C-alpha cells in the first residue's frame, strides 16, 4: 500500500522529471498506483471474508475504515468553499461513480461499492474461482462497452483489477506452488502496450487496459524486492497505515501549495522539486494528524456507548 500511494502522489504532483523513462513510469503512468491499491485491497478482502463471512459484520468493519474519515473531509471542503452543494452531497453519500461529479473522491465511492459486492461475489467465486473470474471480467467488459461515457469506463473497468486480486489471493492460499515467473513477460507486454498509448496519445494516458497485464506481475516483483531489501519495508508499512487519509487530503493541499508559491516565484527545476516534495511531506503529516484525531473521536464515542 505504501508504494502504491507514493506512486499516486507523484502522479498528482508536478515533479520536473528530466529523464523520459522516469517521467513515463512515475508520472504518465502514475494512475497505476490506484490499480495497485485496488489489487491489494481485494487481495486482503479475500482473507478478511474468509475470517468473517457474516455480511453485516463484514460490512461494519469495512465501513468503519472509510466513512469516519471521508465524511468529515467532505464537510470541511464544503465549508471552505471547495465543493458546491451538489458535489458535497454526492461525495458525502459515496455516489460519485453513479452520478457525474468532479471525480475527486471517486475512489471512496468505488471502494464502498466493491465492499457491498464482495461478499456476494465471493460466495459465487468460492464454487469455481477460475470460471467466476473469467465470467466477471467478461461481464465487466460488456458493461463498459455499453457505457455512454468514457469517464465511466475509466472507473468501472477497474473492477477487473479488483477481481484479479481475489483470484491471486485464492492462488496464494490453495496453490502456493504457483509459478510467478510467467507474470514477468505478461507485465512487460503491458508496459509495451502502455508505451504504445504514451507514444501515440501523449503524456496524459487515459487508458486502464494495460494495467490488467502490468499490476499482478508488478505487485509480485515489488513484494520480492521489499522482502530482500528489508530496510524499506518498515517505512512503507508505516506509510501504508495512512494511505486513505493521504488520499483524502493530498490533491487539495497540493493545489493550494502550488498556487501560493507560484505567486512568489517563477518555477524552476530545483524549485519545482522542492515544492512538490514539500507538498507530499506536508500531506503525509496532515494525514497522520487527521487519522489520529478521528481515531480519538471514535474511541471517545465507543467509551461513551459502553458506559451508557
Describe these PLM feature segments.
Residues 4, 27-38, 47-100, 114, ...:
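Transmembrane alpha-helical segments and their boundary/interface "anchor" motifs
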Residues 4-11, 132-145, 185-190:
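Small-polar-interrupted transmembrane alpha-helices in polytopic inner-membrane proteins
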Residues 6-17, 82:
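Alpha-helical transmembrane segments of multi-pass membrane proteins
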Residues 12, 41-48, 75-79, 116, ...:
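Hydrophobic membrane-targeting alpha-helices
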Residues 17-24, 86-95, 199-203, 260-268:
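Membrane-interface helix termini and inter-helical loops of multi-pass transporters
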Residues 36-38, 44-47, 66, 70, ...:
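Hydrophobic alpha-helical segments with transmembrane-like composition
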Residues 146-148, 155-163, 170-247, 251-279:
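Alpha-helical transmembrane segments and terminal signal-anchor/GPI-anchor hydrophobic tails
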Residues 294-308:
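Membrane-proximal cytoplasmic C-terminal regulatory module of class A 7TM GPCRs
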Amino acid at each position: 500500500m505504501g508504494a502504491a500511494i507514493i506512486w499516486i502522489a507523484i502522479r498528482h504532483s508536478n515533479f520536473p522529471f528530466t529523464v523520459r523513462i522516469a517521467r513515463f513510469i512515475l508520472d504518465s503512468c502514475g494512475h497505476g498506483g490506484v490499480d495497485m491499491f485496488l489489487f491489494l485491497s481485494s487481495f486482503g478482502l479475500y482473507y478478511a471474508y474468509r475470517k468473517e463471512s457474516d455480511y453485516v459484520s463484514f460490512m461494519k468493519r469495512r465501513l468503519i475504515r472509510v466513512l469516519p474519515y471521508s465524511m468529515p473531509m467532505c464537510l470541511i471542503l464544503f465549508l471552505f468553499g471547495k465543493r458546491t452543494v451538489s458535489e458535497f452531497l454526492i461525495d458525502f453519500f459515496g455516489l460519485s461513480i453513479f452520478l457525474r461529479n468532479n471525480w475527486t473522491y471517486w475512489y471512496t465511492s468505488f471502494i464502498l461499492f466493491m465492499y457491498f459486492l464482495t461478499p456476494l461475489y465471493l460466495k459465487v467465486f468460492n464454487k469455481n474461482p477460475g470460471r467466476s473470474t473469467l465470467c466477471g471480467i467478461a461481464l465487466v467488459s460488456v458493461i463498459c462497452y455499453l457505457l455512454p461515457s468514457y469517464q465511466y469506463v475509466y472507473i468501472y473497468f477497474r473492477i477487473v483489477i479488483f477481481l484479479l486480486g481475489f483470484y491471486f489471493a485464492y492462488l496464494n492460499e490453495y496453490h502456493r506452488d504457483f509459478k510467478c515467473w510467467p507474470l514477468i513477460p505478461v507485465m512487460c507486454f503491458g508496459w509495451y502496450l502502455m508505451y504504445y498509448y504514451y507514444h501515440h496519445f501523449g503524456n496524459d494516458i487515459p487508458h486502464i487496459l494495460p494495467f490488467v497485464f502490468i499490476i499482478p506481475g508488478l505487485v509480485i516483483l515489488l513484494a520480492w524486492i521489499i522482502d530482500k531489501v528489508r530496510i524499506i519495508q518498515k517505512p512503507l508499512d508505516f506509510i501504508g497505515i495512512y494511505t486513505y487519509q493521504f488520499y483524502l487530503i493530498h490533491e487539495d493541499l497540493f493545489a493550494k501549495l502550488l498556487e501560493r508559491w507560484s505567486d512568489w516565484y517563477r518555477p524552476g527545476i530545483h524549485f519545482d522539486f522542492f515544492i512538490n516534495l514539500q507538498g507530499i511531506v506536508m500531506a503525509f503529516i496532515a494525514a497522520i494528524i487527521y487519522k489520529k484525531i478521528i481515531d480519538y473521536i471514535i474511541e471517545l464515542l465507543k467509551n461513551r456507548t459502553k458506559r451508557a
